[in-house]
Amino acid sequence: MINFNVGAWRPTTGQARAARLASANDLVTRTLAQHGLTSGSGTASSHGDGSETMRSALSGLMARLQPDGGPATPPADIPAGAAFAEDAFTCAAGTRRYHTYVPASAREGITGLVVMLHGCTQTPEDFAVGTGMNALAEQHRFVVVYPQQSRGDNAQSCWNWFSRGDQMRDRGEPAILAGLTREVIARHAIPADKVFVAGLSAGAAMAVILGGAYPDLFHAVGAHSGLPAGAAKDVTSAFSAMAGREAGSAPRDTPTRTIVFHGDADATVHPSNGAAIVRQALEGGPAQSLQTDAERAAGGRSYRLSTTYDADGAEAVEHWLIEGLGHAWSGGQPAGSYTDPKGPDASAEMVRFFFSPSS
């Protein structure tokens, strides 16, 4: 799900662009060698300028990194009285388009906002279908926002969680996403203490960054198959972090309530990253807490659920480790991409966690 290619870096000019391209080419060549996708010499073929060969070989690497089946963008089924509208937000850090789902049930009073960050190669429409979050919004009367990554800022539509310029408050993509969220809050008069963010893969990694950078804005985080904030500072360290090697972690002063889902068969983002998100979420938390572990089954898959409570008995962190699940949204809808219909319903459990009375 999280893929990188030569064109994924933000476009620059002159020497800066050339330097980035050379660095990316070198990284790709070394990565291709690691995955057995190079010639016998251990380097990409050098006929011509090598760019076509590099793109072709990189496509093979992307195929290795992605689950079977490409992304799908089936049409969303919108109930009468509901709205699924596209808009755009612009600030000094840049512009992003987004879709907002306002359920028909909102006329009875809006309960909150869930910001959903898609994974690489996905679209807001696809992610909405795959997670089934709009149906839950109808049931619980909350608004859903689906920001869309620009292909001009990442060629594979990945959120740039591995870029230093996109990991801090009021800079880069966090600034854009926070501003976008505030705009929706004001437009729909959403309760300020019921704003949450969730994501899949690269989207989950960015959701974790947002939870740490804006604890005053996002009151809980849902991370599915993601990585901790600060896990990488560039593409090289991103690959290491995804493989479960040498992952960094940004210190956190304010704990953010977090629910984590990860498959123990995830070959794209190593499951150790889920545990790292949990540790990071608990940093700066209360001195005393209780933890419970339970082994259960749902939807044809076994899973281990670890719950950490704060000193007041409120759920602070949940960690769902799902047996046999790969790099896909647990309990998702088959019509969407990167979903697995088996296992516990990640969307429903995130909504329960977000809107629990103790939140």
Spell out what each predicted region is.
Residues M1-L113, E125-D126, T131, A198, ...:
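A domain-start/cap signature at the N-terminus of enzymes
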Residues A106-A155, G230-A231:
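Short substrate-entry loop that stabilizes the transition state in hydrolases
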Residues V115-T121, S225, H262, E323:
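The conserved beta1-alpha1 loop
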Residues Q148-G172:
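Cap/lid segment of the alpha/beta-hydrolase catalytic domain
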Residues G165-H188, I209:
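Alpha/beta-hydrolase active-site loop
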Residues I185-R187, A192-T254, A267:
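Primarily recognizes the serine-hydrolase "nucleophile elbow" in alpha/beta-hydrolase
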Residues V260-H262, D266:
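Short beta-strand/loop motif that positions the catalytic acidic residue
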Residues T268-N273, S330:
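Conserved alpha/beta-hydrolase "acid-adjacent" motif
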